[in-house]
C-alpha cells in the first residue's frame, strides 16, 4: 500500500500541475478535449486554478513535475524489491540519463523543440526527486529486509521483467506531455 502511495501521489500531483497550469496544447490536457461535457468542466476547473496561478513560483509549474515524475519512477523501481542494489544502479543510470538529457537541451534544444528547453531548476528537482526516493527506499529496504531464502531465480526474473515494463510505462508518461 505504501509503495502505491509513493508512486501514485507524486505522479497525480505532477500530472495535475500539467493539467491545470501548463499549455492546452500538451497531451494531458488534450485527453479531455475528446468529450464535450468533460471538456466544459475541465475548462471551468482550469479557469478557477488560473486565478491562483500568480501565487505559485514558476518552478512549481515548470520544474516540480519533473522531480515528482522521477520520484515516482524511483518508487516503482526501488521500494519492496529483493534486489535493491541492482535496482538502485538501474535507477541511478536513469537519473544520470535525465540530467544528461537536460544538459543536451542547452546545446540542441530550445522552446518548441522535442528535446525541450534547458533549465537548471529541472536538474535541481531531478536531483531532489532522486535523493528523496533513494533515502526513503533505502530506509524501507533496511527496515523490511526481505528474507534471503525467499530469493529465487524466478523472483529475480520476475523483478527484471517488471522493471522493463515500468521503464517503458514511465518513459511514455515522461514523453507524452511534450509530443503534442
Give, region by region, the residue ranges found by the protein language model.
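Bulky hydrophobic segments
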Residues: 1-180
Amino acid at each position: 500500500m505504501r509503495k502505491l502511495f509513493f508512486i501514485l501521489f507524486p505522479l497525480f500531483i505532477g500530472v495535475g500541475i500539467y493539467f491545470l497550469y501548463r499549455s492546452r496544447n500538451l497531451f494531458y490536457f488534450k485527453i479531455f478535449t475528446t468529450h464535450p461535457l468533460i471538456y466544459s468542466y475541465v475548462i471551468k476547473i482550469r479557469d478557477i486554478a488560473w486565478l491562483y496561478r500568480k501565487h505559485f513560483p514558476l518552478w512549481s509549474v515548470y520544474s516540480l513535475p519533473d522531480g515528482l515524475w522521477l520520484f515516482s519512477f524511483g518508487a516503482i523501481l526501488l521500494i519492496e524489491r529483493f534486489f535493491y542494489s541492482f535496482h538502485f544502479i538501474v535507477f541511478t543510470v536513469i537519473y544520470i540519463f535525465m540530467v544528461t538529457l537536460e544538459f543536451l537541451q542547452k546545446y540542441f534544444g530550445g522552446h518548441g523543440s522535442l528535446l525541450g528547453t534547458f533549465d537548471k531548476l529541472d536538474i535541481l528537482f531531478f536531483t531532489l526527486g532522486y535523493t528523496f526516493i533513494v533515502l526513503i527506499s533505502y530506509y524501507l529496504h533496511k527496515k523490511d529486509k526481505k528474507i534471503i531464502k525467499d530469493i529465487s531465480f524466478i523472483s529475480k526474473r520476475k523483478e527484471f521483467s517488471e522493471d522493463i515494463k515500468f521503464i517503458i510505462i514511465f518513459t511514455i508518461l515522461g514523453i507524452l506531455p511534450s509530443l503534442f
